[in-house]
């Protein structure tokens, strides 16, 4: 009986440590996206920030459409090692659509959106 209690305590402690480490790793990976970014082809700037371990990207400047300031461009950003997933707002569809993203070697965000047979890649450059 004593061995069983000891095993349960060990297992509980190990599980707790593993869970805390995985949460810490998740927040570290997603933190690579935090900050201000500019769309490479359009005059749109976003700020990516955490919201309880999930990243969100808010439009902070848009020279073409000032009414979009304060709206979400990215939601539900999660980390999967060196890649990220979430949803991006697609104005043509009027809704959020799943996307994949990664940080390139030059430190920029590469976002891939696939809608049916159509794929589109957009880039965001880090602003300092």
Residue positions per predicted region:
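Alpha-helical architecture
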Residues: 1, 21-22
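Bacterial N-terminal signal peptides that target proteins for export
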Residues: 2-12
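Bacterial N-terminal signal peptides
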Residues: 11-21
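Boundary at the C-terminal end of the N-terminal hydrophobic targeting segment
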Residues: 25-27
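Short, exposed beta-strand-loop hairpins at the edges of beta-sheets
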Residues: 100-123
């Amino acid at each position: 009986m004593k061995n069983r209690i000891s095993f349960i305590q060990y297992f509980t402690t190990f599980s707790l440590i593993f869970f805390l480490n995985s949460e810490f790793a998740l927040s570290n990976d997603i933190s690579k996206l935090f900050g201000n970014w500019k769309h490479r082809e359009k005059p749109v700037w976003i700020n990516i920030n955490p919201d309880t371990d999930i990243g969100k990207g808010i439009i902070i400047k848009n020279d073409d459409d000032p009414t979009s300031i304060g709206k979400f461009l990215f939601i539900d950003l999660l980390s999967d090692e060196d890649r990220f997933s979430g949803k991006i707002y697609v104005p043509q569809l009027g809704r959020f659509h799943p996307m994949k993203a990664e940080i390139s070697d030059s430190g920029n965000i590469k976002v891939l959106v696939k809608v049916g047979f159509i794929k589109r890649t957009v880039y965001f450059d880090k602003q300092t």
